[in-house]
Amino acid sequence: MRAVLIILFVFGLHQIVWSQEGLIILQNESIEFEADGFYINKVEDVRANKENIGFMQKGVFAKTKIDANLKGGVEKAIYNYLKENFRQDTNGVPIVICITQLEISESSGLPITGKAKIKIDFCREKNGSLGKLYNAEAYVEKPAVNVSKTHEERIREVIVSCLESFNNSDWESISPMFFKESEKN
């Protein structure tokens, strides 16, 4: 009986260690510019792998990689962040943000750096179809004393970089081709 309990304990501990996940909460920090003639109507996560957004390391000396995710999921976390922190033109054009890539990681060597990469398609919606207006991507890599605690800053930075790029583009002059999701494949 004792052996069975030990085996169950070790197996249970193994499951707990391997199922750990680092949740990242995007902090409220106002975006310094405002939308020029648009508002974010929706955020869609169209990444091929939606299981996580990368990894973070846990522990001081014996670092363990654990999956990282945005609290509430990518769509909800980014939409709520923009809703609270980005001054938008609610009388403007509704824009759908499609997240095609979002990845974070940490280097293992010294100095330890945190990395964030994002790719976003900015789209208009018409009769249930999306038409791409603009594509933006951003990458940032920065050292930090506690890299895992600063992932959210880097995620916000790459989101804002793409948003500013779209805001400064000539998106209003583009006539997109509209495709339903099933027609793309």
Where are these regions (language model features)?
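Bacterial Sec-dependent N-terminal signal peptides
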Residues: 1-26
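Surface-exposed short loop/turn segments
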Residues: 84-130, 141
